[in-house]
Amino acid sequence: PWINPENQEESFNMLNTAQADICMAHLDLNGFYMHENIRQTHGYDKSIVSRFEKTITGHFHTKNDDGQIFYLGAQYEMTWSDYGQQKYFHIFDTETRELEAIPNPFTIFAKLVYNDDETNYDEFDISPYHNKFVKLVVVNKKNNEMFDRLLERLYHKITVHELKILE
């Protein structure tokens, strides 16, 4: 269940009486990471699923667990908060009760750190930024013409969904 004020009583009753060893739900439990550095503190106590051998749940974007409760995390990047975190698809074997995590190789966010003291951007491979939301973080820009040529390439040689320049 997704527990909310309209179904809270019914959901708790279901969690307490279900004839099951495994719970699969969309839960908001305290102590787990919602995002990489943000731990939930205003949800439900995890004891509401303590009677289950294993609880597999969603809702939080970051994959994390305590050995009994498994947050699968988002399967793909949705926001910049997901950037840099490996995302997974999962297979649950109902006979062995093993949960297999399969890495998702695809991402939609990318950062490009610009430092023209270290890199010649006229020769820089921009293909990894194709079909991405890109943050261009400018650390050192002494060659304005090369910077402009890089921007021109990003806008016209590949497709970027969005380009944010942080100077």
Set out the residue ranges of the language-model regions:
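His/Asp/Glu-rich metal-coordinating catalytic cores
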Residues: 1-70
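Accessory, non-catalytic peripheral segments of nucleic-acid enzymes
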Residues: 94-167
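Short flexible/disordered coil segments
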Residues: 2-5, 87-90, 163
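Short beta->alpha connector loops
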Residues: 2-7, 75, 117-119, 141-143
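Short gly/pro-enriched beta-turn/loop segments at secondary-structure junctions
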Residues: 18, 50, 84-87, 94, ...
